Amino acid sequence: MNILNDKGGRLHLELPAGVADILPEAAERFIELRRTILITMAGWGYRPVQPPLIEHAEALARALPDYDEEVSFYKMVDRLSGRVLSLRADFTPQLARIAATRFAEAALPLRFFYEGPVVRHVPNLNGKRRELHQAGAELMGVMDPEGDSETIAMMVDCLRASGLEDFKVDVGQVEFFKGIFKDVELTPEALYAITDAVKR
């Protein structure tokens, strides 16, 4: 099929930077990997949730006030309501919203898992993807080390079930990092660059 522009010439259908097509062979491997990970998390007693890709920006900000929405979220104006919408950049704020609104009276702990696309605004791509597929889990209502141990053990189980053998698990605490920069005036872009450098 030839796609022509309005002058009869060939149209270059290039994707935006930071996104890619997943073609059949890779897509088949991806589907099988996703299935393996989801079955493993379900085996640990976690239940699936599937939040929407688009949410009201203020709802995400309220669900997780410390989340760096200015750097991470793609935003748009809803033509129906005039309110600001955000594309999902991470599942954690959405699961915080779900727990606060749909499970406020539920017995703790809550165990949820999720998977799906996320779209992130990355100030400097440097070969990074803007559209990713994320799978993960949240254990809510367990504040002691046993909760951390459970989620780490489940993650290791997922990696092994996926066929990985040679991997390393790094455990950190984001509050330490936030405390260091609490009194330093940085733009969201500068803070993102520093955070990204530390991760690497």
Where are these regions (language model features)?
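Extended, charged alpha-beta segments that form solvent-exposed binding/catalytic grooves
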Residues: 2-200
